[in-house]
């Protein structure tokens, strides 16, 4: 499917590496959450929405140093 990323039990680090290709700047994954598993379909034309969805469904936070430098880290309690 064009414009859609389909993930089936994909490592979070691998999903974010793929998202990084479709977004200006950089998306990085902290080692503490890199091996979390992700499944779903994600629209590549809205990477912010993907990051929001990950934050809502996984124990992660999304830290924006700027619009162009994003890191996904373990959620704080």
Residue ranges and their predicted role:
Residues 1-77:
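A residue-level detector for the "anchor" residue at the start of short, highly conserved motifs
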């Amino acid at each position: 499917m064009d414009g859609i990323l389909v993930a089936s039990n994909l490592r979070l680090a691998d999903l974010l590496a793929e998202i990084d290709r479709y977004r200006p700047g950089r998306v990085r994954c902290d080692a503490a959450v890199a091996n979390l598993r992700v499944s779903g379909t994600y629209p590549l034309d809205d990477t912010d929405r993907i990051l929001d969805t990950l934050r809502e469904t996984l124990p992660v936070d999304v830290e924006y140093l700027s619009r162009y430098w994003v890191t996904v880290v373990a959620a704080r309690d």
